[in-house]
Design a protein with these regions (language model features):
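N-terminal loops that bind phosphate or other acidic moieties
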Residues: 1-81
């Protein structure tokens, strides 16, 4: 995401130091957002969509992708039996 269109800061844990500092920055600046709970599907979504989505769209799609990537494989396999 180009700085002219916005900045997305990703942090690992909500409430951790990186998240808290990023949030303070985002609250003071225009077109800066922070998401936490980063996982690999979220990063892949970010890299593939950062040139085609607005900052708000990117935040929403990254969060949705991260949540969709959380699974319990054993439960899924047991349900398929």
């Amino acid at each position: 995401l180009d700085q002219e269109e916005g900045v997305l800061i990703m942090a690992d844990l909500f409430g951790g130091t990186p998240s808290n500092l990023a949030t303070k920055i985002a609250l003071r600046k225009e077109n800066v957002e922070t998401v936490t709970g980063v996982n690999l599907p979220m990063i892949i979504q970010f890299v593939t969509e950062r040139e085609t989505q607005t900052l708000d769209e990117l935040v929403e799609s990254c969060i949705e992708t991260a949540q969709d990537g959380i699974k319990c494989p054993t439960k899924i396999m047991k349900e398929r039996r």
